Amino acid sequence: MIINSISEFLQAADIKKQILGIDFGEKKVGVAISNIEHTVAMPLQTILATNQDRVNKIQEIAVAYNIGAIVIGLPFKLDGTETSQTHRVKDFANKLANKLLLPIFLCDERLTSKAANNLLKIGNIKRKVRNAIDDRVAASIILEGALKRMQNSKSYF
């Protein structure tokens, strides 16, 4: 089930379980995971696979970690308009929703990839390593933003 509002997401999610965060890209998909208390988002892995294989890999992760919900970053232009990548992410989210019986929250992800890259640069991480892990770091930034929105929501408590 695809969800666009944090209050609906909180009603649908099993908040006693960890949440998965996803930064979808054509070549790489970054994956992050929350702790059980939903206070921290941690980079988990980067998936390099085709569309259906990506869905299968995420399903494997969801089962292995007993995930209660998923957050997927939804890219927009700075002015809030959709891009071709926005539509690809929505298509991917629909495929994932058809495969998994978990609530999926589509969360605005403007500038998260840039923030992830800048964060890794500040840490003096070499470019080759940055390129290998930037998607999972972006996924953790996306998930962290959703976790903060959850904590700020009155329906969370």
Curated annotation (Swiss-Prot):
| Keywords noted in UniProt | Cytoplasm, Hydrolase, Nuclease, Ribosome biogenesis
Q: Give the family this protein belongs to, as stated in its UniProt record.
A: Belongs to the YqgF nuclease family.
Xref: Pfam families: RuvX
List the protein's name.
Putative pre-16S rRNA nuclease
Q: Where in the cell is it found?
A: Cytoplasm
On the tree of life, the source organism's domain of life is Bacteria
Q: Which InterPro entries match?
A: RNaseH-like_sf (IPR012337), YqgF (IPR005227), YqgF/RNaseH-like_dom (IPR006641), YqgF/RNaseH-like_dom_sf (IPR037027)
Functionally, this protein is described as follows: Could be a nuclease involved in processing of the 5'-end of pre-16S rRNA.
Q: What is its EC number?
A: 3.1.-.-
Per the record, the GO terms for biological process are: rRNA 5'-end processing
Q: What class of enzyme is it?
A: hydrolase
Q: What cellular component GO annotations does this protein have?
A: cytosol
Which GO MF terms does the UniProt record name? nuclease activity
Query: HAMAP family from the entry?
Result: Nuclease_YqgF
Question: According to its UniProt record, where is this protein mainly located?
Answer: cytoplasm
